[in-house]
Amino acid sequence: MIKQTVCGLLLGAAITGQAGAAEKLTLVLDWYINPDHAPIMVAEQIGAFKAEGLDVKIVPPSDPALPPRLVAAKQADLAITYQPQLHFFADQGLPLMRVGTLINTPLNTVIALDKSITSPADLKGKTVGYSVSGIEQATLATMVEHEHLKPQDIKLINVNFQLTSALLAGQVDAVIGGYRNIEALELKLQGKTPVVFNVEDYGVPAYDELIIVAHRDAVNEPKIRKFLAALKQGSDYLHAHPQDTWLAFAKARPELNTELNKQAWQ
């Protein structure tokens, strides 16, 4: 995920680490740990968080819709979420602000295995699985309207994290929310030939896939700026040492040492 990874700092200059007890910070990921989180993992690898005086707890979510709401409730300091989703949170009055960028290009797709589905127009009367309420329904609606369908022509069901397994089991005809560098690649490695529709090719404006949000009251806290400074160091090191960082990641997390993650890391 190196080519599409950035760690934009929206809060100004970094604050260097100071002596004393490490300051605790909780980051809730958007999904289970995967190569899209590589800059975070590398910042941890190289000790960048510790150098900034931080003790960072990285938490995969129990529900992919939950992370920003935990930040809004002040149960976590930061969360990874999706740029379009931020507009939904604003409409709901959630006190969230974007503080940084993790992935600055779209990754979202609609994926099918049925070769008769050659465009989103062929989803009429089909069942589509999704994982994150709100944004994925809106994204799919834009895509099918671009193809002159109505959103109600498609049945949607929430499959949570089980995008590929729901597709492989025939529970759904297609899924939205699978990434072109993760779920599409996973299916190929399983010998399948997925039909992949990139969302930006069907009326969805380009956007930043993964962003970092904080509670509105906390955006000026020094630990937020320290985290972003460390993350930038992780991103820079990742770009300079892709193979070394993969090997370190695979060693530290052997359960994630798979061909899928190895290819996606690049």
Where are these regions (language model features)?
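Short, glycine-/small- and polar/acidic-enriched structural segments
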Residues: 24-160, 164-169, 173-181, 196-197, ...
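N-terminal secretory signal peptides that target proteins for export/translocation
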Residues: 1-2
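Extracellular glycan-interaction surfaces
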Residues: 187
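Periplasmic-binding protein-like
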Residues: 102-111, 192-217, 228, 263-266
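Bacterial N-terminal signal peptides
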Residues: 5-17
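Secondary-structure end/capping motifs
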Residues: 220-266
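Second-shell loop/turn segments in exported
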Residues: 126-130, 171-172, 219, 232-238
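Boundary at the C-terminal end of the N-terminal hydrophobic targeting segment
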Residues: 19-21
